[in-house]
């Protein structure tokens, strides 16, 4: 550690450690699971077209009867406006004038530079956009609605776009009893059946698995359920140790904060660590403690993130980027303006295949 002057006694020196950086407790999960597919648009509004095909069993007819006919395909579309999320900052002479770099390891002589201040601001801005995208995706999964808190997508009585409403379906909610004497297998079988039924009209390939994003109380009740414990006592396999010791494993691609256990063909992920800090510093989990959200894996294009280009001459009518950074120094040389934006819409094209479960004890 370097020696620096003691700020309380300039006649003495102290050892300076590396800088301890306190960051907001913002944790995401959707990227690691690979749930969303990006689509880069050239416009600020997209049209999701839907075609309903008609195919059914053909019945026999008498030879002199009129032949059977097949109904034509039904077509409709859904217009969706992509919200605009901008966040600005600036660098001024006061940010570097006589300011010592916070992570300087020399004798307080390294001063801030435009480059170092820019790097710090870039990191903070990117993290703000990143957790906003994650919160928007989790809002879609849990409520079926598009994140637009200021009402830019308001339509009549609807504060924002709701994919359950747009597709004319109702969110399936399955209470699950995880009390000590309950056998939850039937409830989870019903959940998987509801997911398959939600996918049936679309035929988007085979389901490769099921995953549940679970709140802390729900996950704890599952681990402590007596039926679950008894079921694994008399079998030999990788599931025994996590259940009997109460130490769940991890899921490929997720860090150790997300404990998991796989039973009955469902991977349960304790998603209580995923969330964000609000303005007051309170941690807000994406999944409520007593809730769980069940999703199919391997379904093509179930979740989408549509990006729109920035509203500038150099970007309009061109393929969008995931995010934008614009920087301008004024002629008076006393400020550098930083303008960043993300323009995205998260969409669930098969909302009936997302099943909500509530803990019932």
Residue ranges of model-derived segments:
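N-terminal alpha-helical "arm" segments
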Residues: 1-46, 344-361
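Charge-rich, low-complexity N-terminal segments
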Residues: 1-16, 191-192, 196-201, 208-248
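Short alpha-helical segments and helix-capping/turn motifs at coil-helix boundaries
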Residues: 32, 193-198, 322-324
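Assembly/oligomerization interface modules of large self-assembling protein complexes
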Residues: 35-103, 156, 160
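Long, contiguous amphipathic alpha-helices that act as assembly "spine/axial" helices in icosahedral shell
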Residues: 84-169, 183, 187-220, 334-342
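Charged, low-complexity intrinsically disordered segments
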Residues: 173-175
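Sequence/fold signature of self-assembling virion shell proteins
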Residues: 225-361
């Amino acid at each position: 550690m370097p020696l620096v002057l003691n700020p309380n006694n300039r006649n003495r020196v102290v050892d300076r450690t590396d800088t301890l950086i306190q960051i907001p407790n913002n944790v995401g999960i959707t990227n690691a699971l690979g749930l969303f597919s990006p689509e880069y648009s050239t416009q600020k509004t997209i049209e999701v077209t839907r075609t309903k095909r008609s195919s059914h069993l053909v019945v026999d007819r008498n030879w002199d009867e009129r032949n059977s006919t097949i109904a034509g395909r039904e077509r409709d579309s859904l217009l969706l406006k992509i919200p605009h999320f901008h966040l600005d900052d600036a660098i001024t002479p006061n940010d570097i004038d006589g300011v010592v770099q916070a992570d300087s390891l020399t004798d307080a002589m390294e001063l801030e530079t435009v480059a170092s201040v820019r790097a710090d601001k870039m990191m903070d801005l990117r993290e703000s956009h990143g957790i906003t995208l994650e919160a928007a995706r989790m809002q879609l999964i849990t409520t079926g609605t598009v994140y637009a808190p200021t009402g830019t997508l308001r339509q009549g009585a609807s504060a924002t776009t709701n994919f359950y409403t747009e597709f004319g379906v109702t969110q399936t909610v399955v209470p699950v009893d995880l009390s000590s004497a309950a056998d939850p297998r039937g409830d989870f079988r019903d959940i998987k059946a509801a997911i398959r039924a939600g996918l049936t009209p679309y035929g988007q390939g085979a389901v490769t698995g099921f995953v549940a994003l679970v709140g802390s109380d729900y996950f704890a009740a599952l681990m402590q359920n007596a039926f679950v414990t008894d079921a694994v006592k008399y079998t030999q396999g990788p599931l025994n140790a996590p259940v009997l010791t109460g130490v769940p494993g991890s899921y490929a691609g997720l860090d150790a904060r997300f404990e998991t256990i796989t039973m009955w063909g469902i991977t349960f992920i304790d998603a209580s660590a995923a969330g964000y800090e609000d303005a007051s510093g309170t941690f807000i989990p994406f999944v409520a403690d007593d809730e769980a959200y069940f999703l199919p894996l391997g379904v093509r294009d179930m979740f989408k993130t549509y990006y729109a280009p920035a509203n500038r001459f150099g970007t309009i009518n061109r393929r969008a980027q995931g995010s934008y950074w614009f920087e301008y120094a004024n002629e008076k040389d006393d400020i550098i303006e930083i303008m960043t934006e993300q323009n995205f819409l998260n969409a669930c094209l098969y909302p009936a295949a997302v099943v909500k479960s509530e803990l019932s004890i």
